[in-house]
Every structure is written in C-alpha cells, then in structure tokens.
Amino acid sequence: MSENPATPSVLVISAHAADFVWRAGGAAALSAQRGSAVHVVCLSFGERGESQGLWKQEGMTLERVKQTRREQASAAAEVLGASIEFLDLGDYPLRVDDAAQDRIVSIMRERRPDVLLTHVANDPYNRDHNLAHETTLLTRMVAQAHGHDRSTTPLGAAQVLQFEPHQPEVCGFAPDLLLDISPVFDLKVKAMRAMSGAQGHLVQYYTDLGVRRGVQAVRNGAPKTVTHAEAYQRTFPTVGEELR
C-alpha cells in the first residue's frame, strides 16, 4: 500500500492487451501524473479475438500478432505513465491456470496496490472479461491470506473498481464513480491511437464515450470545467467519516 494516501498505488488486471487503454487509460494517466505507481497486467495479448485489423494483413501469423500487440500495448502504457507485463495466457478463450493465479498473487503482494482496476463480473459478449474479474477477486483473496507464503506480506483491503464494459446496458453495469479525466484526456487519446492498428474503430467510440461521461459528471455535481470522464463501479463499500 502507498504510504501517501494522496497517491494510491494502482494495479490494472486487463484480460486483453488493449482493454486497459480503452476503459481505464484516463485513470492510469491521472494516477501516474499525481505520483502514483501504476502497473498493468495483461492476461493475454488478445491475439485471436481482438486483433481484427492485424489479421487482415496478408501473411499474418499468430506470433507476429502477439509481438505487435506487445509493442502497441507497451507504447500505450508508456504514454500513460504505467509499467506493464504480459502473462500470455491466450484468448478466446482465456484460461487462467494455478501457475498464473500464483503469479498474479505474487504481483499483488509485490506491488501492494491500494486500488485494483478490472472488468465487470458479467459480460455476455466476452467471457474472457468475466474470467479476468473472477481471477482478480480470487487472487486478491489469496493475497490477503496470512497463511499464504509466509515469506511475503499479506495484501490489505484494496478496493476493486470495475471499469465500463463495451456494452454496459447488458452487463449490469451501475457506475458509482465518474472520474474526471479532463486533464489527461489527450494522453488517453494518444494511447488509444497506439493500439489503433488492431482495433482502430474503437478510438472514436471511446473518445465519444469520454465526452458523454463528462456531461454526466457535470450533471452529477462536477464543475462545469469537466469535459471528459470515465465510469467505474465499486465492488466493496467505501469507508468514511462523513455522509457524502
């Protein structure tokens, strides 16, 4: 956990190599600019199911797609100010075995995040996202267990924020946080463009979504200077000393 409450450390668990950019790029950039440590774990490259643009290129191979996705996601993370690693677990379907779970637990204990960002629990369009959500909760639980690996320190009560899915209306997504990302939206756009070779059609979609969520943030009490926002749903209660 961060020693400074003003700069909570952030760990992002992303099912595919681009998910963190579209859905949490603003949060990552904002946190990094404020001095927080931000680390991204990509469970897969999204090489089979989320690299449409690359597969349209003549002579493309699976290994070339994976390498390209690694390069693109690494470039995007650099723009956002985050570090990144890839577990290469495959996609469509994603499979997380015991060794991968142990690795994620180790990352959590090493990184000691105050906040975890990941997918929603139920995305009927993409079951890889569901597994990423369940894996995040499972490994968080294990990382908190005092009897697990006594050579490392147990994780504290890190909040899990679920970022907005592509089809929120059918995923049961009920946001309770609209995060103002206006100061870093240009960085999010730059990071999204780094991924555009595989999924270029999503750049405009998530640009428009940022504007819509910004309008909703103002409607819900944010200053009128807010132009862009990202939506999140908390998994656990927040703790406070006042009603607000």
Give names to the regions the model predicted.
Residues M1-R111, E241-E242:
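Active-site rim/loop-helix segments in enzyme catalytic domains that contact anionic ligands
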Residues M1-I13, R34, S83, P93-R244:
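Metal-dependent de-N-acetylase/amidase catalytic core
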